[in-house]
Design a protein with these regions (language model features):
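His/acidic metal-ligating clusters that form di-metal
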Residues: 180-187, 263-364
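Beta-strand-enriched, solvent-exposed domains that form extended recognition/catalytic surfaces
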Residues: 31-145, 423-524, 541-549, 553, ...
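Proline-centered linker/hinge motifs at extracellular inter-domain junctions
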Residues: 51, 411-413, 520-527, 535
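Extended active-site neighborhood of metal-dependent phosphoesterases/phosphodiesterases
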Residues: 127-138, 202-287, 316-319, 336-342, ...
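Long, low-complexity serine/threonine/glycine- and acidic-rich segments characteristic of extracellular
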Residues: 101, 106-113, 482, 491-493, ...
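Binuclear metal-dependent phosphoesterase catalytic core
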Residues: 356-461
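N-terminal active-site segment of His-dependent metallophosphoesterases
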Residues: 50, 59, 75, 115-201
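Secretory targeting signatures
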Residues: 1-37, 642-643, 649-650, 654-762
Length: 762
């Protein structure tokens, strides 16, 4: 038996290895709890640039099992293998297929799908040596199709804007998605103006929204004038023109009719050439649909005419022509495209842009063909009528066009002197919101209609980073007969898949939330470091106060705020207003003006709730002084009263918490018919906010004084109040700091051991 003798160099090398292993284990133990609670990806970060040029989330390739298609790469990628994957059905079944491919030119690939692939919309994954590139919701596999094609049309989504502010636009967009899924479409069409300013952030939000809210449905869309130049549109949504054949029965063509900077021309001849070639190449397909942003007609009702009829004159102010002003600048292009529509017996032309409904039944006296021109109102932006989406069924045996849901006021293709109609289903009937904080989401749906029931099973996909075992689900119904239930959920990569069952009868509402952390504390309200300006509140001049409202867990409830000044409620304007961000931190900028001549004490009350139901009220005394007076007290101070509890009565809820047993997920469930929670806080808080007539406040060193509220206004004091709000997102600084400390410690230890080793071996 041999004894191995180690010299000092070997001993120090072994010691160094042991120390490094120990440090690695320690780092792993420290980091793991924090890694499991990393913040979810933001909506903008969730969206990725497309690696291909000829298909994408709003222009998926349509193929049958065993067929091949081509794709043009946008970069110099050395692709090693390609696969498709999707999540399907109420059981969230994962489908995954490897694809054969070959390079047929410098950047063009020929990709073939296997015979055994199932129906559905898929993500295409391109894998290189050191990277993976995703084309989300970009391949639509059709084995067989029903004899009815149900189409939902959404136009003018205007991400980044809304009819009043961005928040109202966000609510309309979420409502449109929930309404669309409840209609169970075969296909969804987007008719342009997806972004509001064509910015990268707006277009990335659109990609995330398309993935998150409309996951199971194919979406075919075109850009509009607000997506001008289309560069960001191409980067994140797909090509600006395309032709897709659906099951050899329906041809859908998308063209870009809104290039800016082309004088008196709504369409380029390149687009017309593309349209004509597509119609000619697929002339054998029985039914044809064209999607374009600008409508060819500005009219409501029936037209019996032909492309070269002299009655089709360009629009001029005061004229009665049915030709839209947008195409009137180039009547040659208008007549040429209309002739193509007649020659190839186009079934329908879908448009948007004008933010109202206009339906035209066009019958050609030359070809004896009928084409339906359907122009739809905006889904989310301002409108002279309302926001809505359109749904129609196309019978693939007869070509008949039918409307399965007709809202009150529906007139179809009947003539109307108002040149508009109310044919779309209003998105406001299903008011829906998705609220998120860094580790929290809540979907709420309120069915305002008396004539429509929301009934659907749909998959939502949430950007996610927490493990499956930490997920908590809370689902509740404001009305006992309304259901909004997460029946199944699973985490795959950086996304949480949830199957949601919706059954919400008229005039009922429900909500469901999912979180990765507990919420055990109420929000916090504080003056920021800036506090207020000027440093002395002066009568008859503007005072601006800066507040920060924070909730670290489930975030702030944007529907439950109360702001009162001198006992009178204040309607607060938020800027910017959006709910497509983390709502865990908010900055308030409140501007106040008090008119008068004498030193005046006023009271500002701020009440907020979080998404769990915790609430907090803060009262601030604000003293206004005559000009030139130097105060001896703090002019802005918190009013401290006797501690009292908050009482919150919650609607019936069902809590679902996950526990893991031998690799399988089990559920522990409890149900309460009424929940009351009590919290103690260091300040007096009452959720009733009952307005008193007279209040007396004593502070030190402020002398006792009496203020009179707006019910008994002082003769020398008149209050004018304006407010604004700014949002901010909390950063995960705890993880950054901890990681920095650990890294620095490791570096120092390694350097010290290296120096010691050098000394021993020298």
């Amino acid at each position: 038996m041999h004894r191995v003798m180690l010299n000092s160099k070997h001993r120090y090398s072994i010691a160094l290895c042991v120390v490094l292993i120990y440090i690695s284990a320690l780092v792993s133990l420290i980091i793991q709890p924090f890694a499991m609670s990393e913040l979810n990806p933001s909506y903008i970060d969730f969206a990725k640039q497309l690696p291909v040029a000829d298909f994408g989330p709003t222009a998926p390739i349509v193929v049958s099992p065993g067929e091949c298609f081509t794709g043009t790469l946008t970069g110099d990628y050395e692709i090693k293998y390609i696969y498709l994957w999707t999540i399907k059905g109420e059981e969230l079944k994962l489908l995954n297929y490897s694809l054969k491919f070959e390079k047929i030119s410098g950047s063009t690939l020929r990709i073939c799908v296997p015979e055994e692939v199932d129906n559905g919309v898929y993500d295409l994954e391109l894998v290189a040596d050191n990277a993976q590139y995703s084309v989300p919701r970009s391949v639509w596999i059709i084995k067989q199709l029903d004899n009815k094609l149900r189409v939902v049309v959404m136009s003018d989504l205007h991400f980044g804007a809304g009819p009043v502010n961005v928040t109202t636009g966000d609510i309309n967009r979420y409502s449109a998605a929930v309404l669309a899924t409840s209609l169970n479409p075969t296909l969804i069409l987007w008719a342009g103006d997806i972004a509001d300013t064509a910015s990268e952030s707006e277009t990335r939000l659109a990609q995330t929204y398309r993935y998150m809210m409309l996951y199971s449905y194919p979406v075919l869309g075109v850009p509009g004038n607000h997506d001008h130049l289309g560069e960001n549109y191409r980067k994140y949504l797909g090509p600006t023109r395309w032709a897709r054949v659906i099951s050899n029965k329906t041809l859908v063509i998308g063209i870009y009719t809104t290039p800016y900077f082309i004088e008196n021309n709504v369409i380029t001849w390149d687009e017309i050439v593309f349209l004509e070639e597509a119609l000619r190449n697929y002339s054998y397909v029985p039914y044809k649909i064209i999607v374009t942003h600008y409508p060819m007609f500005y009219y409501q009702g029936e037209l019996i005419t032909r492309y070269d009829d002299e009655s089709l004159q360009p629009y001029t102010q005061g004229s009665s022509t049915p030709v839209s002003s947008y195409w009137s600048g180039n009547m040659t292009a208008f007549r040429y495209v209309l002739k193509l529509i007649e020659d190839y017996n186009v079934t329908a032309v879908i448009s948007g842009h004008i933010h109202v409904d206009q339906y035209v039944k066009y019958t050609s006296t030359r070809t004896n063909t009928t084409t339906y021109f359907i122009t739809v109102t905006t889904a989310a932006h301002g409108s002279s009528t309302y926001q809505g989406i359109t749904v129609f069924d196309l019978d693939l045996n007869t070509g008949e066009l039918m409307f399965p849901v007709k809202p009150p006021g529906f007139i179809g293709f009947n003539n109307s002197t108002s040149r508009s109609a109310s044919n779309s289903v209003p998105v406001s009937i299903v008011e829906s919101k998705v609220i998120r904080a860094p580790l929290f989401y809540k979907l709420s749906v309120y069915n305002r209609a008396s004539w429509y029931t929301v009934n659907a099973s749909t998959i939502m996909v949430l950007p996610w980073s927490t493990s499956l075992e930490k997920i908590q689900i809370r689902q509740g119904s404001v009305n006992n007969n309304a259901e909004l239930i997460i029946s199944k959920h699973d985490v795959i990569g950086d996304r949480l898949f949830v199957n949601i069952l919706m059954n919400i009868p008229p005039k009922t509402s429900a909500e469901v939330s999912v979180s990765g952390i507990d919420d055990t504390s109420p929000p916090r309200i504080e003056l920021t470091g800036k506090k207020y300006s000027p440093p002395v509140p002066v009568l008859n001049k503007t005072l601006t106060l800066y507040f920060k409202v924070t909730d670290d867990a489930w975030g702030l409830d944007y529907s439950n705020y109360v702001f009162r000044y001198n006992g009178t409620s204040i309607k607060v304007e938020y800027s910017p207003q959006t709910i497509m961000t983390d709502l865990n931190e908010m900055y308030l900028t409140i501007t106040l003006t008090v008119k008068g001549v004498n030193k005046t004490l006023t009271i500002l009350e701020i009440y907020v709730e979080d998404n769990y139901g915790h609430s907090i009220l803060r009262k601030y005394g604000i003293i206004f002084y005559p000009a030139g007076v130097t105060p001896v007290e703090d002019p802005v101070f918190e009013v401290i009263e006797t501690t009292s509890p908050i009482t919150i009565t919650s609607p019936p809820i069902t809590m679902v918490t996950n526990t893991t047993t031998t690799g399988t997920t089990t559920y522990s469930t409890y149900t309460s018919t009424s929940t009351t929670q009590t919290q103690s806080t260091p300040t007096a808080i009452t959720t009733s906010l009952t307005k008193p007539t007279t209040q007396t406040y004593t502070t030190s060193p402020t002398p006792t004084m009496t203020i009179t509220t707006s019910e008994q206004p002082a003769s020398t004091s008149e209050t004018k109040i304006t407010t604004s709000t700014q949002l901010a997102i909390q950063q995960p600084t705890y993880t950054i700091v901890l990681t920095g400390i650990v890294v620095v410690t490791v570096v120092i230890v390694v350097i010290a051991l290296y120096i010691a080793l050098r000394k021993k071996t020298s």
